[in-house]
Structure formats: C-alpha cells, structure tokens
C-alpha cells in the first residue's frame, strides 16, 4: 500500500491493529460496518496511496482477517447444523466479520451453504450487531416472525442483546469454557446456555418444539 518497512509484519501489528481499535470503537458506537474501501482509506491506511488502497481494499480486508486465524467450524458443528435442518428447522447466519469474502468462502469450503436460508453480513448490509436492523433483514428473507425465532450466539453483548431487542422468542448463549463465568446483566441475559454446540439437538427435537426440561439456566454453575 505504499509503505516501506524492514519488518512489514511488525509494522502491521503496531500500526494497523492500533488503528483498527479506533475504528472498532466507532463501529460499536454507531452499530455500523464501514465499506471495505472506506475502512482502509479512512481508518487503517489513510497515509498510504489512496488509489492502491481503493484497488486492493477487499484483499486487504481478507488478509487482515487471516492474520487473526482461520475460522473453523466448532466440534460437531457441521453435523448439528445438518441434523437441525433434517428436523425441519430454518437456519440463518448473522455475522459481524470484517470483509465480504470470509463467510462465503467458509460456507462453500465446508459445504454448509445449502443449510442456511439467510446469511446476513454486516460487511454487506453495513449494519452490525446488536443493531436491530440486521436481525430484521434475516427474518424478512426467510419470512419468519420474531416470536418463532431463537438466536444462538457466544457474545452476550452483541448476539443476545440484539436478538432481545427485536423480541426473539428465545436466546441461547454458548459457554465454551465452563470455568469462565458469564458476565450477565439484565440486558444481555439469555434464556438458556449450552456448553457444546451439539447440545442444541437436545433442546430442539422437532420443528416447532422446545425441550424446556433440557434448558440450562445461564446462571447455572456461576
């Protein structure tokens, strides 16, 4: 992007990560995701050649995400998604990942695209969680009513708050680390929690049904 440095990896960590923190504050404040070109020209590489940034913004986003590690499906995740689909549930994704490429690439590489009837990305809609609009986009695409929806997420302050803001009928958080207590508040408190993604199969036996007796209160074990 027009910068000369003896250690590009270190420069990237020292400069771009710091600038991204400032961008993230803005994004969370306004519940907005900036277009890829704007992200780099306004926040991350404003002192670089603007024309080169414009041409390479999408690739820069993708490579920046790769420095954070490749996203992989959680253990039992693919099998759980396929089984829930077989049981008749309509499923979707609402993602706040930066860049337009990563989610689509992941869905195609893992063969999971056919199992999701809506995929909403803040990098496409420019609306991010917990902003209510992106949840409405998802419901509108599949023709769902909020009272018939359940949101499953691992971030209380984005996933759960947003789902509750649009009156989802149910919210479930994933507590992957049992020994790390959830930081619950009245606003982000989900209806239940699970410790493993496949635990969803115990909760949702059949479309239109919830096994209430299988629900684990979010305070359990805290």
Label each residue range with its predicted role.
Residues 78, 82-83, 90, 94-222:
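Asp-based, Mg2+/Mn2+-dependent phosphohydrolase catalytic module
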Residues 1-75, 79-82, 86-87:
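N-terminal helical cap/lid subdomain that shapes the substrate entry/recognition surface
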